[in-house]
Amino acid sequence: MTKTLPPVTVIGGGLAGTEAAWQIAQAGVPVTLYEMRPVQKSPAHHTADLAELVCSNSFGAASSDRAAGLLHEELRRLQSVIISTADQHRVPAGGALAVDRGVFSQDLTQKLAEHPLVTFRREPLDQIPSEGITVLATGPLTTAALATELQQFTGLEYMSFFDAASPIIVGESINQDIAFLASRYDKGEAAYLNCPMDPAQYQAFRAALCEAEQAELKDFELETAKFFEGCLPIEELARRGEDTMRFGPLKPVGLFDARLGDFRAPENKGKRPYAVVQLRQEDKQGQLWNMVGFQTNLRWGEQKRVFRMIPGLENAEFVRMGVMHRNTFLNSPELLEATLQFKKRPTLLAAGQLIGTEGYTAAAAGGWLAGTNAARLAQGLTPLTLPETTMMGALFEFIHSASPKHFQPMPPNFGIIPPLAERVRSKKERYGVYRDRSLTDLEQWREESCRPAALV
């Protein structure tokens, strides 16, 4: 049967593309994997190996009661080639899953090259194939030619080329004795949490922003950043003048804590905030909140230090830090199903950072699902979605159902998982219950989904 099936095409040999190609081949479906290196070089890569780790050698926390660790364990149970190879080449790193990155990538390259159903093409592919089943896994440094092709396919407004994202905070870590729920001038639904500042708090915050240490943009990001004047980092606004932030994202006009009375009453004039940091709901459950207008290029440690100076955010737990860097990604809620198929063309799938997930393990998870579903499409089977109670299922449901207007790339985190039926106060215990529920539901799903066994 395998000889009669046309090959699936996978474009991109990073973590997502490598995982996708492996899952397709392991399901007994031939696959052609395109990787442009070394014929065409990338500004971030140093080798021609598959799944090269271009930043850290760490896949994040290893413990399964942490978000990254739970995703590792889910992928282990789903026979991910990325995670099994990472386990094989693990190096000491405290509580993290870290690898010998050179040996890790070389081993994966060899595994794919030796698989009888994988055809490895080292050449750029600058057009999306018009026929057949294809997985796009070209990553944040997608070539200009293929990016243009994607723009034509998706529409210009549905692609981003520079990621300027604000931090995202766990809702329960926000002090709501200080933060208040309101919309400006009480218009519409009270959709924002607001953190008020008095003059002294504002001046101290501005001074800390101006002095905080910034991350360095890489050489290949500098040119893109020049065109980003319309979305300036918060620290640049702070440097431009004492009141620049107060007339921008920290504008206090029309925002008042109703618990203090009627904001229109003359006796309450002195209670009106001098500046306000707004937080916008990021997910359906209201467990995650985005700091509006706080795109930043500060180092992550500095972000935590400075942003915790904001009243109400003293104990803020960040699930994503603010970033400003080169990152080609799709507006996935507008374009993709939770199966990672394009809505307008179900035989085209996408995975990795291109779909708006963050991190090595999330890229592998996207490759697993896109590859599995590409193989199922080739075999005439219905594509799968994972339970939302799993980290994988929650992540892909988020990128499918988040607000298209405010979509930002998202890393694995417990804030996107549906809440428990009964509240568990201890965070450590709660994350352990999330883990137990996830792995139980994953095992049941595996039994019921009847995923076809490998044919090779």
UniProtKB/Swiss-Prot annotation:
Q: Which UniProt keywords apply?
A: Cytoplasm, FAD, Flavoprotein, Methyltransferase, NAD, NADP, Transferase, tRNA processing
* Top-rank EC class of the record's enzyme: transferase
Reported cofactor(s): FAD
Q: Output the Gene Ontology terms for molecular function.
A: flavin adenine dinucleotide binding; tRNA (uracil(54)-C5)-methyltransferase activity, 5,10-methylenetetrahydrofolate-dependent
Superkingdom, taxonomy of origin: Bacteria
In the Enzyme Commission scheme, what number(s) does this protein have? Answer: 2.1.1.74
Reaction catalyzed = uridine(54) in tRNA + (6R)-5,10-methylene-5,6,7,8-tetrahydrofolate + NADH + H(+) = 5-methyluridine(54) in tRNA + (6S)-5,6,7,8-tetrahydrofolate + NAD(+); uridine(54) in tRNA + (6R)-5,10-methylene-5,6,7,8-tetrahydrofolate + NADPH + H(+) = 5-methyluridine(54) in tRNA + (6S)-5,6,7,8-tetrahydrofolate + NADP(+)
- Residues annotated for FAD binding in this entry: 12-17
Pfam families, A to Z: GIDA
Spell out the GO cellular component terms annotated for this protein, sorted alphabetically and separated by semicolons: cytosol
One GO term of the biological process aspect: tRNA methylation
Major location (coarse):
cytoplasm
Q: Does the keyword tRNA processing apply?
A: yes
The places in or outside the cell where this protein is found are: Cytoplasm
Identify the HAMAP family for this entry: TrmFO
Describe the function of this protein. Answer: Catalyzes the folate-dependent formation of 5-methyl-uridine at position 54 (M-5-U54) in all tRNAs.
Family according to the record = Belongs to the MnmG family. TrmFO subfamily.
Protein name listed in UniProt: Methylenetetrahydrofolate--tRNA-(uracil-5-)-methyltransferase TrmFO
Organism, as annotated: Picosynechococcus sp. (strain ATCC 27264 / PCC 7002 / PR-6)
- Taxonomy-wise, where does this protein's organism fall, top ranks first? Bacteria, Bacillati, Cyanobacteriota, Cyanophyceae, Oscillatoriophycideae
